[in-house]
Amino acid sequence: KYAKVASLIEKRYNLHVKKLTKREIFEEGYGRRIFEIINETFAGLYGYSELTDKQIEQYIGMYFPMADLDLITLIEDWNADKKIVGVGITLPSLAKALQKCRRGRLTPFGWWHILRALKFGHTKIVDLLLVGILPEYRAKGANSLLFADLIPRYVERGYEWGETHVEMEANDKVQSQWQYLDCENHKRRRCYIKEIK
């Protein structure tokens, strides 16, 4: 389903998938542009505070060296001089690997479990860490390009489940993008307010 919609969107709006190299991230400024897109796409979400330049530099240096670039996808608008309009950053889940590390310790052998999860795919879960499309492209179905690129890669690597980041239950647009998948809501967070007199 995503592949059919993606091919239509690609032809109609001239949107295309872009895969990155380490050189593009660190030397050509794509790392910074990714987080600028995240700031723009998440700006209207409840509780989101914009990342500062210092935080962006820290995240680029901390996460991109270990990231599998095959699991990171950008969407470009070729009508707008290859402007980045969407981003999907995913990683193999480290939850089981961290549980196997004795109380989170990386030494003496905890690092091995994390390496296996990151590089050798010894996990069945992929974490969809940061997925966002610019507001003016959401109605055009640009997210279908992300999923049409990423889902076959997940299947090829043997991932069976995807874990998304926090989503508001009232955000119908985000909830509707999962309608074509066998999804299950298994975590729920609540915030309560009490006036102090």
Annotate the PLM regions.
Residues 163-165, 182-196:
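Conserved catalytic-core motifs of GNAT/GCN5-like acyltransferases
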Residues 133-138, 164-174:
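Conserved beta-strand-loop-alpha-helix junction that forms the acyl-donor binding cleft
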Residues 1-21, 190-196:
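Acyl-donor-binding surface of acyltransferase catalytic domains
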Residues 37-41, 59-62, 66, 149, ...:
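Generic, well-ordered alpha-helical scaffold segments in large soluble proteins
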Residues 125, 129-133, 138-154, 180:
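Conserved acetyl-CoA-binding loop-helix of GNAT-fold acetyltransferases
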Residues 125-126, 154-168:
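Conserved GNAT acetyl-CoA-binding A-motif
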Residues 18-133:
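A conserved beta-strand-loop-helix scaffold within acyl/acetyltransferase catalytic domains
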